[in-house]
Amino acid sequence: MEFLDLGPFSRASGTIRLPGSKSISNRVLLLAALAEGETTITNLLDSDDTRVMLDALEKLGVRLKRDGDTCVVTGTRGAFTARTADLFLGNAGTAVRPLTAALAVNGGDYRIHGVPRMHERPIGDLVDGLRQLGARIDYEENEGYPPLRIRPGQINADAPITVRGDVSSQFLTSLLMTLPLLRTESGVSTVQVDGELISKPYIEITIKLMERFGIKVERHGWHQFVVPAGQRYQSPGTIMVEGDASSASYFLAAGALGGGPLRVEGVGRASIQGDVGFADALIKMGANLQMGDDWIEVRGVGHDSGKLEPIDMDCNLIPDAAMTIAVAALFADGATTLRNIASWRVKETDRLAAMATELRKVGAKVQEGEDYLVIEPPEKLTPNAAIDTYDDHRMAMCFSLVSLGGVPVRINDPKCVGKTFPDYFERFTALAQP
């Protein structure tokens, strides 16, 4: 197995310009593909997840011109020209879920599959919602999970669609992005959310991006979403992908743990991503933090001890960045509790179990519940811990922060960061100092 040894480091400072957001990149690619007109996308993330989306769109007949972090997409006016396709989508939930919905109403014969872990990530609630529209979708192996076979169905969007909201917000995102492709006699398409909707900021991203492409979504609280009929996706001409706020969290934490000043450019007060809320969590933990419209800067912590304050936090709104809080909790002056993180269990790995296991390797006492973690930091971090990453990019990036505790740490399978941030470790070590 490949591994990477980091540290020991004690300082971190400098400036980093973030790569484009994964969540925004894949949404914008699909919206541009479905729109009328040509869209130029700038600061597009180059990663495993965006590459599988790009490859899939090309197989579906979409014309793309790529040049570095810029991609020009010629829209299909709401219907893919390829009526058959076999699409391998890796472990990219941001590709599998929205493409499943778009293809379910496209009138073709498609197969969607991915890596083994993708076939363990649930999609049943989305399929149930699409079947309410008349979509024909079959499970090839296990009920409720990919791989999927999609065939032409009799699509009718007049009746409201009901979808669960407590497993993944991507199910609702996928339905919302698909509804403008449909005609209705009632004049509206409606989605009702059953139960508590998790990761609400990701739905806000979807709605705001749909607006950029000319689609108005009416939101009634968090339980009903209405798309008026007669709308079509229209290219905005040019759209820039803002920096990835989840990726920002590692560098913001490094600025707190390593003294800074460390400035992150590409996200800030004007960001549409919920994970920018990680900055608020870091302030509650005692970090000295300033924020502009598209930058955030951290200069260590405000306590003479140099330690962070422990917090008790509901992480529903920042599920990905909450992983960074879990590792930052190793540097706190007391036990930190992270709540409402059940969605971690159906991500790239079971992140609750994985996080608890790896935190214990560096000396923490960890209590793992169904939807929470309690992390009690050690007196001293265990040096030379070998961190398993579970083919999960965020596990690898989070645990790089351990090296800022003045101890070396080994990251197994470091190339898994290719999912969202291929050169993460080069960028991290350029800012960290002994």
Swiss-Prot record:
GO terms for molecular function: 3-phosphoshikimate 1-carboxyvinyltransferase activity. Its main location: cytoplasm. Belongs to the EPSP synthase family. It is found in: Cytoplasm. Monomer. 3-phosphoshikimate binds at K22, S23, R27, S168, S169, Q170, S199, D320, K347. The active site is at D320 (proton acceptor). Catalyzes the transfer of the enolpyruvyl moiety of phosphoenolpyruvate (PEP) to the 5-hydroxyl of shikimate-3-phosphate (S3P) to produce enolpyruvyl shikimate-3-phosphate and inorganic phosphate. GO terms for biological process: amino acid biosynthetic process; aromatic amino acid family biosynthetic process; chorismate biosynthetic process. The lineage of its organism: Bacteria, Pseudomonadati, Pseudomonadota, Betaproteobacteria, Burkholderiales. The keyword Zinc does not apply. Its EC number is 2.5.1.19. It catalyses: 3-phosphoshikimate + phosphoenolpyruvate = 5-O-(1-carboxyvinyl)-3-phosphoshikimate + phosphate. CDD domains: EPSP_synthase. Pathway: Metabolic intermediate biosynthesis; chorismate biosynthesis; chorismate from D-erythrose 4-phosphate and phosphoenolpyruvate: step 6/7. It comes from Paraburkholderia phytofirmans (strain DSM 17436 / LMG 22146 / PsJN) (Burkholderia phytofirmans). One of its GO terms (cellular component) is cytoplasm. This is 3-phosphoshikimate 1-carboxyvinyltransferase. Keywords: Amino-acid biosynthesis, Aromatic amino acid biosynthesis, Cytoplasm, Transferase. The gene is aroA. It is an enzyme of class 2 (transferase). Phosphoenolpyruvate binds at K22, G93, R121, Q170, R351, R394, K419.
